């Protein structure tokens, strides 16, 4: 929750507890043992309903959550799949740094190409 320019985690309010299912210590964890065999780098992500556009916001999120990346829909996928006991995997390709508003510096084409490459490798590994 954002209030007066500061971010307050929902767990610091009376809305929910950080260990209420499907949360584990405030995180939506994918503990699927089948994922351990995949040779993919892991990242800690936070999901926001906005685009972070300042260095102050970026630092607040890094300090509060030690997050590697920011998404706008990742938590919804995790939440629903955990609630419904549906196996899932979220693969991300990074196009820009948090807070970078100059879209000419974003590398969307390269990010999509890298994602497609990794998906082809993953599909090949899973089907062979």
Task: Report the location of each language-model feature.
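Mid-sequence, gly/pro-rich, charge-dense loop/helix-turn segments that line enzyme active sites
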Residues: 1-65
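Gly/Ser/Thr-rich active-site loops/lids in small-molecule metabolic enzymes
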Residues: 1-5, 66, 70, 111-115
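A general structural signal for short secondary-structure boundary/capping elements
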Residues: 21-26, 92-94, 115-120
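A structural motif corresponding to the C-terminal end of an alpha-helix
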Residues: 36-39, 80-86, 121-125
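Juxtamembrane helix-loop transition sites at the ends of transmembrane segments
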Residues: 45, 94, 111-113
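A C-terminal functional module that forms or caps the active site or interfaces directly
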Residues: 50-99
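His/Asp/Glu-rich mid-to-C-terminal helical/loop segments that flank catalytic regions of hydrolases
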Residues: 98-128
């Amino acid at each position: 929750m954002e209030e007066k320019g500061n971010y307050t985690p929902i767990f610091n309010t009376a809305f929910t507890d950080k260990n209420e299912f499907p949360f584990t210590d405030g995180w939506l964890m994918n503990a699927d043992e089948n994922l351990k065999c995949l040779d993919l780098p892991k990242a800690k992500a936070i999901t926001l309903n906005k685009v972070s556009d300042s260095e102050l916001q970026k630092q607040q999120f890094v300090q509060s959550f030690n997050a590697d990346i920011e998404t706008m829909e990742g938590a919804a996928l995790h939440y629903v799949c955990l609630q419904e006991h549906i196996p899932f995997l979220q693969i991300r390709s990074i196009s820009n740094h948090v807070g970078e508003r100059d879209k000419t510096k974003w590398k969307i084409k390269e990010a999509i190409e890298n994602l497609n490459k990794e998906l082809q490798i993953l599909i090949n590994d899973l089907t062979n």
